[in-house]
Curated annotation (Swiss-Prot):
Enzyme class: ligase
Cystine crosslinks: none
Keyword Glycosyltransferase: no
Gene: accA1
Protein name: Biotin-dependent 3-methylcrotonyl-coenzyme A carboxylase alpha1 subunit
Keywords (A to Z) from UniProt: ATP-binding, Biotin, Isopeptide bond, Ligase, Magnesium, Manganese, Metal-binding, Nucleotide-binding, Ubl conjugation
Residues reported to bind Mg(2+) 1: E275, E290
Length: 654
């Protein structure tokens, strides 16, 4: 076994790999870019090496720098995690030349499976079923149009290189195919540097089911059951589970054999995942889609039902050991479901979010696991993937796993950064999800019905009472500075605070000291109230009913969470709210953290409502920000500037 392993990744997967290395007594080495200098994976590793600045191509994707870090620290092996260099055949080959063990498959396996056309042809030779279609190198648009008539509509255009849904197009009308091919080639070339396309017949009501395989260098291959990954948004998985509620035992055995044959066709070594497409209408029929030649984000659900540590077996296989079990030894126990917590705002079309994590609260308990990259103080920016945390629940059956996951998410809060936790719970409560009636369109269909929960009265009241407590604390015993509310003449005046949330804003009035106060939200009833505040908990009693909240505050931004959700309250003193309405210019505000890649207007020019003012890139997506009104524009940013969420980028005045 190795004594030092370098983890060539970041975020939750790096933390998770380091956890296994620590358990096995193996020295861990982290690598990091400048924004990640204080990241959790860096702090938890035994050693760490700086790679370079934020752009991945200058840090995490720089093969030379990663191998140099391994040489400097004496690492005998490199674990690539997922993403970055994990499926890079050149990196695997470079590791071999440097005599460092790449904890993944041989370079040839990565090359074959990374080319969708070559992969389909390779697995078909081993009797693995493939989707009817046409997959040859060098197919022109005219050839693809001709072939589509034979394949049968609807057809799915797919790029030979890459993944993540980029370059994919669903075409149901033959007249739209030529235009879709042009668009798909352009996106494939932009994303992967390769515009090779192929066609597949589109499977109606498709379900995405994948099989985990493990293979050693001695010819042994086993599968560890399947995972259901149909709950996706824009081809990105959100909730995954194992086993699939769709497959019967006979189909499970057949699809497992097909996955093992897929691994054998490229002499696979290590952990890999074979993805299949299965029609919800024909669950006994499955087709090969692709093989991911790495550990998957969703591997914890397989670990939960098998009791195996997949990272440990990557290490053992990489060190030359044989698998310590045969196919008949593997028993699937219970059901496990994983939810991915992203930095995104579901109420704003899932725009990426960001900011500084003020506090993080993660669940624990029977059957609950959390794989996380977060610490208080972590800065979530736009340089990397928005995945923050994975919450996994294991139960005796699917119903128990669903309930445990929902309860775990209710105890999950990331204060300081907007996340999708509320949306995840919305999905778990959906009837189709509860009964397992899934396909890859379910999540997108249900997204349209999601509405974020406005801040309830008690949360707004808690915000006002917290403000009263903070004022009293700052007074530090100064009788005249404390917010008692008493004024000359014997009457009591309230301290008013405007509490603004994305969906609701109210003025909260508080009379008296925080331990014995009265509170009013808007024009509602005046209630007796009190508040007690500790470092992580705020206990508020209103009319005899006590509620406990988790909280964090910075720069008059207060975050409050309980089992119902998380709310971001912005405080403004009452006198600052009443301004001359016409005097304030309209603003163009960034809805997410990112980088300015274009400024489309000149500062001082006259523009019209709807004109694009600034283009911001975040998470590899471009967002054009338009003028809300007509007028003269003052641009406040330049191309290349890094901007924060809600940062004012331009002002427009009549």
């Amino acid at each position: 076994m190795f004594d030092t392993v370098l983890v060539a990744n970041r975020g939750e997967i790096a933390v998770r790999v380091i956890r296994t290395l620590r358990r096995l007594g193996i020295r861990s080495v982290a690598v990091y870019s400048d924004p990640d200098v204080d990241a959790r994976h860096v702090l938890e590793a035994d050693a760490a090496v700086r790679l370079g600045p934020a752009p991945a191509r200058e840090s995490y994707l720089d093969i030379g720098k990663v191998l140099d870090a391994a040489a400097r620290t004496g690492a005998q092996a490199i674990h690539p995690g997922y993403g970055f260099l994990a499926e890079n055949a050149d990196f695997a080959a470079a590791c071999e030349r440097a005599r460092v063990v790449f904890l993944g498959p041989p370079a040839r396996a990565i090359e074959v499976m990374g080319d969708k056309i070559a992969a389909k042809n390779a697995v078909a030779a081993f009797d693995v079923p493939v989707v009817p279609g046409v997959a040859r190198a060098g197919l022109t648009d005219d050839a693809l149009v001709t072939a589509a008539a034979e394949v049968g509509y609807p057809v799915l255009i797919k790029p030979s290189a890459g993944g993540g849904g980029k370059g994919m197009r669903l075409v149901q009308d033959p007249a739209r195919l030529p235009e879709a091919l042009v668009s798909a080639r352009r996106e494939a070339m932009s994303s992967f540097g390769d515009d090779t396309l192929f066609l597949e017949r589109f499977v109606l009501r498709p379900r995405h089911i994948e099989v985990q395989v493990l293979a050693d260098a001695h010819g042994n291959v086993v599968h560890l059951g399947e995972r259901e990954c149909s709950l996706q948004r824009r081809h990105q998985k959100v909730i995954e589970e194992a086993p699939s509620p769709l497959l019967d035992p006979q189909t499970r055995e057949r699809i497992g054999v097909a996955a093992c044959n897929t691994a054998r066709c490229v002499d696979y070594v290590g952990a890999g995942t074979v993805e299949f497409i299965v029609s919800a209408q024909r669950p006994d029929e499955f087709f090969f889609m692709e093989m991911n030649t790495r550990l998957q984000v969703e591997h914890p659900v397989t670990e939960a039902i098998t009791g195996l540590d997949l990272v440990e077996w990557q290490l053992r296989v990489g060190a030359g050991e044989k698998l310590g079990f045969a196919q008949n030894d593997i028993e699937l126990r219970g059901h496990a479901i994983e939810a991915r917590v992203y930095a995104e705002d579901p109420a704003r079309e899932f725009l990426p979010t960001g900011g500084r994590v003020l506090a993080v609260f993660e669940p624990a308990g029977p059957g609950v696991r959390v794989d996380s990259s977060l610490l208080g103080g972590t800065v979530v920016g736009s340089d990397y993937d928005p995945l923050l945390t994975k919450v996994i629940a294991h139960g005796a059956d699917r119903e128990e796993a669903l309930d445990r996951l929902d309860q775990a998410l209710a105890r999950t809060a990331v204060l300081g950064v907007q996340t999708n936790v509320e949306f995840l719970r919305f999905l778990l409560a959906d009837e189709r999800v509860r009964v397992g009636d899934l396909d890859t369109a379910v999540l997108d269909e249900r997204s349209a019905d999601f509405t974020a929960r406005p801040a309830p009265d008690d949360v707004l009241a808690a915000g006002g009472l917290y403000r009263q407590w903070a004022l009293a604390r700052r007074a530090q015993g100064d009788l005249w500075a404390a917010p008692s509310g008493w004024r000359g003449g014997g009457h009591m005046a309230p301290v008013r605070t405007a509490m603004r949330t994305p969906l609701r804003s109210e003025t909260v009035s508080v009379w008296g000291p925080p331990e014995s106060a009265q509170v009013q939200v808007g024009d509602g009833e005046i209630d007796c109230a009190s508040v007690q505040v500790t470092r992580e908990q705020m206990s508020v009693t209103i009319s005899g009913l006590r509620r406990d909240y988790r909280w964090a505050e910075a720069d008059r931004h207060l975050w409050i969470a309980d089992e119902r959700g998380t709310w971001h309250l912005r405080e403004a003193e009452e006198h600052k709210i009443h301004r001359a309405v016409g005097a304030r210019p309209a603003e163009v505000v960034s809805p997410m953290p990112g980088s300015v890649i274009a400024v489309q207007v000149e500062s001082g020019s006259q523009i019209s409502a709807g004109d694009v003012v600034v283009v911001v890139e975040a998470m590899k997506m471009e967002h054009s920000l338009e003028a809300p009104v007509s007028g003269r524009v003052q641009v406040l940013v330049s191309v290349g500037d890094q901007v924060k969420v809600e940062q004012v980028l331009a002002r427009i005045k009549d």
